[in-house]
A protein has these predicted regions:
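Mixed-charge, glycine-accented linear interaction segment located at domain edges/termini
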Residues: 108-172
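Intrinsic-disorder/low-complexity loop/linker signature
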Residues: 6-8, 98, 140
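Acidic surface patches and DE-rich sequence motifs
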Residues: 4, 95, 137
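Solvent-exposed edge beta-strands and adjacent loop segments
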Residues: 1-63, 109-124
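Structured, beta-strand-rich domain cores
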Residues: 41-105
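Short amphipathic beta-strand/extended segments with alternating polar/hydrophobic composition
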Residues: 11-16, 101-107, 144-148
Length: 172
């Protein structure tokens, strides 16, 4: 599910082929007399997401900022006037052990332009490849996750995909 900044509701994007996340870290090293004595690694609150999926046309036009008031209805454009908006992304996935996991990325922005492959005579519609930068929210976090089996709150399970917010997942 995706919600573009300034909108009230998440839109369904339930046709995801693959999702690959990489969260950034920073390592601080303490040296004494030229030898490493201590290392500390911390998350930076940002990262990247690579998605391979089918995107509804309305969502595609929004996340690439392709709508122009000066163009006829049904005509879209991409170029120097396209400013990628920030958006939130939520997912319900299976982990490597077949456990249901909820994922949320509260502050995202596309870091790549439109990229599509069209093949005449293809048996299947090609998925879009999108590179997404993850940014920290007001809590300094760029990703939230929860195993369904560990969630005690039915409200969180029901609201995660369509109404994710920091308020929803805060401890009571």
């Amino acid at each position: 599910h995706i919600k573009v900044a300034g909108e009230d509701t998440y839109e369904d994007m339930n046709c995801v082929g693959s999702s690959e996340e990489e969260l950034a870290v920073r390592t601080i090293t303490k040296k004494c007399r030229g030898r490493i004595r201590k290392k500390r690694t911390r998350g930076t609150g940002d990262g990247a997401l690579k998605e391979s999926l089918h995107v509804p046309r309305t969502v595609y036009n929004k996340i690439y900022d392709m709508t122009r008031e000066k163009l006829a209805k049904g005509v879209y454009a991409y170029g120097e006037n396209s400013k990628h908006p920030e958006f939130s992304l939520t997912q319900k996935v299976l982990d490597e052990d077949e456990n249901v996991k909820y994922k949320a990325y509260p502050r995202c922005i596309l870091s790549s332009g439109p990229s599509r492959k069209i093949e005449n005579g293809a048996e299947e519609v090609a998925e879009l490849e999108m590179t997404i930068d993850l940014m920290p929210d007001e809590n300094g976090e760029c990703m939230y996750e929860a195993l369904e089996s560990e969630l005690e709150s039915e409200e969180i399970k029901q609201q995660w995909l369509t109404n994710f917010s920091l308020e929803l997942v805060k401890a009571v």
